[in-house]
């Protein structure tokens, strides 16, 4: 009986530790007093970090893309991104639905059908924004990504360093962080 009690207590403790560990993984600070109206407009995706196998395979061929953030009818955001894919410009729009605290959104992945959460962790609205995205991709594969948005195609070195520090704080290693090269292709789509 004592062995059964000890086993049960061990399982309970493992469960509690598992819950605590899961909660700790998603603790991303949000931009204090996030102002959605100031976040609207044109952004360049200048930096990425991800644990995704797709990202690791493709990161050397990725290039900067342009995104436009506009208000949606439900109080969320329409995020329309145009990027180069197979030598052609491709445009995709995501509906970011408000998910509680201002600066926190969720969207459904058109490819996987899964729900992803997006946090605007830090922004000055005029120069840069740091975002963190998490979700499940495919069969139980956790997906995490940090993104650097810049209002220009040439973010300052201090902004790049801020992004690197942010990405490492989220658990990404140096080799999982990439600054996307500029391209003239597909950049005129959202002027």
Swiss-Prot record:
Could you tell me what this protein is called?
Answer: Prostaglandin-H2 D-isomerase
Enzymatic class: isomerase
Domain-level remarks: Forms a beta-barrel structure that accommodates hydrophobic ligands in its interior.
Question: Which SUPFAM superfamilies does the UniProt entry name for this protein?
Answer: Lipocalins
Disulfide pairs here are: 89-186
Q: Name one GO molecular function term.
A: retinoid binding
Q: Which organism is it from?
A: Ursus arctos
Q: Please state the Enzyme Commission number of this protein.
A: 5.3.99.2
What GO terms in the biological process aspect are recorded for it? Answer: mast cell degranulation; prostaglandin biosynthetic process; regulation of circadian sleep/wake cycle, sleep
Q: Which residues are glycosylated?
A: 51, 78
Keyword annotations of the record: Cytoplasm, Disulfide bond, Endoplasmic reticulum, Fatty acid biosynthesis, Fatty acid metabolism, Glycoprotein, Golgi apparatus, Isomerase, Lipid biosynthesis, Lipid metabolism, Mast cell degranulation, Membrane, Nucleus, Prostaglandin biosynthesis, Prostaglandin metabolism, Pyrrolidone carboxylic acid, Secreted, Signal, Transport
Family to which this protein belongs: Belongs to the calycin superfamily. Lipocalin family.
Tell me where it mainly resides.
endoplasmic reticulum
């Amino acid at each position: 009986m004592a062995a059964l009690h000890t086993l049960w207590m061990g399982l309970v403790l493992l469960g509690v530790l598992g819950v605590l560990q899961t909660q700790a993984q998603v603790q991303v600070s949000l931009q204090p007093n996030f102002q959605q109206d100031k976040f609207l407009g044109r952004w360049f995706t200048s930096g990425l970090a991800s644990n995704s196998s797709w990202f690791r395979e493709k990161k050397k061929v990725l290039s900067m893309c342009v995104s436009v953030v506009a208000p949606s009818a439900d109080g969320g955001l329409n995020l329309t991104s145009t990027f180069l894919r197979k030598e052609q410009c491709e445009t995709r729009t995501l509906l970011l639905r408000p998910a509680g605290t201002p600066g926190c959104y969720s969207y459904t992945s058109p490819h996987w059908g899964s729900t992803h959460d997006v946090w605007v962790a830090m922004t000055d609205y005029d120069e840069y924004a740091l975002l963190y995205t998490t979700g499940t991709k495919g069969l139980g594969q956790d997906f995490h990504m940090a993104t650097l948005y810049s209002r220009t195609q040439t973010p300052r070195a201090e902004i790049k360093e801020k992004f690197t520090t942010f990405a490492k704080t989220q658990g990404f290693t140096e080799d999982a962080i990439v600054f996307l090269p500029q391209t003239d292709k597909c950049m005129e789509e959202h002027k």
